[in-house]
Amino acid sequence: MAVFKVLTPADIVAFSTGLIAGVDEVGRGPLVGDVVTAAVILDPNQPISGLNDSKKLSEKRREALFDEICEKALCYHIGRASPAEIDELNILHATMLAMQRAVAGLNLAPKLVLVDGNRSPFFSHNSQSIVSHSIIKGDGLIASISAASIIAKVTRDREMDALDAAYPQYGFAKHKGYPTKAHFEAIAEHGVFDQYRKSFKPVKALLEG
């Protein structure tokens, strides 16, 4: 894996201690709700089999792995950015903020943070800066990122299920807030409410129309 070709001495220390946090996000594309991120530090003495990119796992498998990760990980934390923050900052910067919150909230301070994707924000924990690397498709390559992907995905899906119970006419349980035909039809008929991202073009167009 390419990430291991650019390790610094500080990174090597991090690997030797095992304090590596994997970070991933879910929910950049939906029209509604928070963007959700997770940071996970796995226990090398309690390996978890079957970890992978959450999008490649069935809902049943994700739920089972979610419980196992919560039980076996040294620590994990969920970070998020609200629709209001997304509208203020834009989705990219809001996602970076949510990732920073996830890492800052860990009970243990990682020495290295591995982030899925092609960019990584500045991370700190208790005012101490942390080395980080971004890894393209890391959620299918690095166990801790896979675990973070699963924690974030299950968390956000459950929130969409709760939103579906409160607003059944929108069909959130099926489309999870993503811009599908059924979702567009629902907001055209019923309008939008506070948890919608008003800066996103389809929502903005409806509000301005």
From Swiss-Prot:
- EC number(s): the record gives 3.1.26.4
Any one GO molecular function term:
RNA binding
Q: Which cofactor does it need?
A: Mn(2+); Mg(2+)
Tell me the SUPFAM superfamilies matching this sequence: Ribonuclease H-like
* Cell compartment(s), UniProt: Cytoplasm
Keywords of the record, alphabetical order, are: Cytoplasm, Endonuclease, Hydrolase, Manganese, Metal-binding, Nuclease
What CDD domains would the database entry show? Answer: RNase_HII_bacteria_HII_like
The protein's predominant localisation is cytoplasm
The reaction(s) annotated as catalysed by this protein in its Swiss-Prot or TrEMBL entry are: Endonucleolytic cleavage to 5'-phosphomonoester
| Domain RNase H type-2 per the UniProt entry, residue ranges | 18-209
Listed GO CC annotations: cytoplasm; ribonuclease H2 complex
Database matches in InterPro entries:
RNase_HII, RNase_HII/HIII, RNase_HII/HIII_dom, RNaseH-like_sf, RNaseH_sf
In terms of PROSITE patterns, this protein maps to: RNASE_H_2 (PS51975)
The family note in this entry says: Belongs to the RNase HII family.
Matching PANTHER family, A to Z? RIBONUCLEASE H2 SUBUNIT A (PTHR10954), RIBONUCLEASE HII (PTHR10954:SF18)
Which protein is depicted?
Answer: Ribonuclease HII
Gene (name only): rnhB
